[in-house]
Regions:
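A generic structural motif
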Residues: 1-2
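Conserved mixed alpha/beta catalytic, RNA-binding, or beta-rich assembly cores of soluble enzyme
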Residues: 5-75
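A glycine-rich helix N-cap at a beta->alpha junction
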Residues: 78-104
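Short amphipathic alpha-helical segments and helix-helix/interface helices
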Residues: 49, 79-83, 120
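Short, well-ordered beta-strand core segments
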Residues: 62, 91-92, 128-130
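Low-complexity intrinsically disordered segments
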Residues: 114-131
């Protein structure tokens, strides 16, 4: 039988993707998740938001548009989760036009009120966009 010698040094592993520098943006356009029952959709949105920390350091920014801005102004688990994410360094942008439309500008409790140019720029800078 032929004997094969093992190399003196193991081959180098492929370099791991640098997840620290990757930018994941989450674009939320409604205050519920999915279509059908809004009560179920509200629960699903709570579960979605509380699962976001699992993305780790790549979670860079959350953008709230249209009905999604209600999450930044309505008391409840979603608002609490958004506040926690922001305190952990996640940037939250909230559409000012949308807040005005829903008369929520004064009620907003989390995030930075912003404009569409900032939203477009954020989308272009992100390595990955998640849209539930």
């Amino acid at each position: 039988a032929t004997q094969v010698e093992a190399p003196e040094q193991a081959p180098a592993a492929a370099p791991a993707a640098d997840t620290e520098s990757r930018k994941t943006l989450v674009l939320i356009t409604t205050d519920t998740l999915g279509r059908g029952d809004d009560e179920l959709g509200a629960r699903l949105m709570e579960n979605f938001l509380t699962s976001l920390p699992e993305l780790g350091a790549s979670l860079w920014r959350i953008v709230l548009l249209n009905g999604g801005v209600k999450l930044a102004a309505t008391e409840g688990k979603c608002l609490d989760t958004l506040k926690q994410l922001e305190s952990n360094g996640v940037s939250i942008l909230v559409c000012g036009t949308c807040l005005n439309f829903f008369n929520l500008l004064e009620a907003k409790q989390v995030g930075e009120t912003t404009n569409m140019m900032d939203v477009v720029t954020s989308l272009s800078l992100a390595d990955k966009v998640i849209r539930p």
